[in-house]
Amino acid sequence: MSNYEKTQQLPIYQKAELLFQLVESLAASLPEDNELLQSIKEIMRADAMMLPAKIAGAEAGNIYSIRMQNAAIIRFHAMSIYTQVGGLRMYDDTIDKKFIQHIRTEIENFRLLFINWVQSFDTSNYIWDEWELFNPKGAIPPTDVDSFDFDDYMDESN
């Protein structure tokens, strides 16, 4: 089984795919004659597309700091969908509020899967994040002793 096939079996990936399908269904139901709704539709679609893509990106490697960067992006886009979908509630006559609540419930389910998924990341396999945002707890920054000096590996007879 390929790494991508394994990723597709993850509950968080499957939930991300479901959210994409739900957003697509909601977007298809929005009236075409409202510019604001069309803008919201495009934002929601873009956000929903990012979820499975970034999960696959995080699963493609095992470096903690890179996985956390992807996780932060996933969180941002999931929260954006939640906000955009919630904003649609003000369109009483055109939007099915039960469907909106269903999507928001699925985002909450996604959030719970997300928490478990992030907790599964290997914190011992990291590259130091100079911005110090994605370093695992207790990570020690590199020192000058840790740096690479090309001259250390050159034969002095040359």
Predicted feature locations:
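Amphipathic alpha-helical assembly/interaction segments
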Residues: 1-158
